[in-house]
Amino acid sequence: MVDVSSIAPDAMSKDESIEKEHTWRILGYGNPGTGKTHFGFTMPKPVFCIDTEGKAHSITEKFDGDIYIFEVDNYDEAETALSQALDGLEAYRNEENQIGTLMVDSMSNMWDWAQQKYVELDNPGKSPHEVNFSSALGSGQSDWQIIKRLHNQRFRERMLDTEFNLYWTGTSSEDYGAILEGQDDPPAKPDGEKNNIYKSTEVLHFY
């Protein structure tokens, strides 16, 4: 029998791969009331939930294990909650040897809030619907580049850079590209930053 460990010491065997703990990166999207939040609380505990909708607390009594909820109302509060949630998950890993879950309910709202955060910086008192995001700033960066930095680098990438389980929810919308192409029954897609779906290893559509 070939002693692969002596030839390729960095290679993982089948048995080792089976024993290795799987880390989940899940995006669950759908209409309200389809069970997206419910599913999140079944993820590996502890679950630290950043709740942008103010509803998650109403179903926690149904679940066992440690669940912590941050009820947030804007981008800044969500960013602070993210830092605290990561600290909490790190403490559980170090002290209890538990790899928990970071849940954001929902990432659709985070995309809206990143836009609102940018508007507050450049156009105080206005909403994103009142601002044209097509102009370039003096630095040469477009409005959308700044918004994506708020959402992607300052928020999403911080989660993706961890070894914890991730669960994001999103609302459902029609694929307008498919509509423009003339499809009679266009597929649904998750609302929010368009690359969220590609940053997930599993995508669940809740009906």
What are these language model-derived features?
Residues 7-8, 16-104, 108-113:
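Conserved P-loop
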Residues 12:
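N-terminal donor/sugar-recognition subdomains of glycan-related enzymes
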Residues 25-28, 144-146, 182-183:
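Short, flexible loop segments at the rims of nucleotide/cofactor-binding pockets, characterized by
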Residues 33, 151-152, 189:
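Amphipathic coiled-coil/heptad-repeat helices and related helical stalk/stem segments
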Residues 45, 66, 118-122, 184-185:
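Glycine-rich, phosphate-binding/catalytic loops in enzymes
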Residues 74-163:
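Phosphate-binding/switch loop-helix module in NTP-utilizing enzymes
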Residues 158-207:
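Phosphate-binding/switch region of NTP-binding enzymes
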